[in-house]
Amino acid sequence: EARDLGLGRLDGPRLLPYGNAGRGVYCGGMIQSNFSVVILAAGQGTRMRSDTHKVLHPIAGRPMLLHLLSTVEELGASRRIVVVGKGREQLEAALEGHGVETAFQAEQKGTGHAVQMARDALHGFSGPVLILYGDTPFVSGETLARMLERLAANDRPGVVVLASSPQDGKTYGRVILGEGDHISKMVEYKDANEAERAVKLCNSGMMAVDSADLFDWLAKVGNANAAGEYYLPDIVMIAKEEGRTPVVIEGEPFETSGVNSRA
């Protein structure tokens, strides 16, 4: 559900702080200018109880999806792809003129399947990919820059997951840490045992992944889980099995808050 984020009035700059980003990501003395973004927006958003597509509901007078697109545009993303499903006509009309490509997910088979729909749009691209959610518009440019910087580090983690520790973890998937920022395990709430559900660190779903590996790993994701869906976070364990060391970046809880009602 929509949360009181403690930000007071949600004006533009305060809603989406850009940090020191500018054109191309500047973070810690490093420039990362060649990256793409995939935004998942194919969910039906039935809890919004509205004919307007979920990600087009306004925040501070502007559709939430456009807030997120402004953030990644300010960072200098070379390609911006929005995965659409039901209500695609509304979305495509709203995105016209914003330099965004769309990919269509005809069936709702999970987040891993949704990202696979962006494969053709990313054809020929070599570089990091940020995977974001159209109904989670509060993530800051500074946090996204940190994710890209960590992905490019010398230890080549392969996957960087954005997590947070909200006061009420509700039914979020959990991130189990190993040494340092290394991820030992990720588990969806539906599939977690009691000890795993007690972990405070929650998966936001947002991540940064090298494009060279992304679709190979997605092809190995199965759907033998409680929901029968292809989970995007499963690529973390696949990366580990292939010798990579996926890591976590922790953001503020408000950055990972999804909007699920019109309140």
Predicted regions and their residues:
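Extreme N-terminal basic, low-complexity initiation segments
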Residues: 1-16
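Glycine-rich N-terminal loop/short-helix segment of MobA-like nucleotidyltransferase
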Residues: 33-59, 75, 95
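Conserved N-terminal catalytic core of the sugar/cofactor nucleotidyltransferase
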Residues: 18, 26-36, 62-149, 154
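Short, structured coil segments at secondary-structure junctions
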Residues: 52, 76, 96-99, 179, ...
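Short beta-strand/turn micro-motifs composed of small residues
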Residues: 41, 84, 133, 163-164
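Catalytic-core segments of class I nucleotidyltransferases/pyrophosphorylases
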Residues: 182-263
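A short, conserved acidic/glycine-rich loop-to-beta-strand motif
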Residues: 154-165
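Rossmann-like NAD(P)H-binding beta-loop-alpha module
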Residues: 143, 164-195
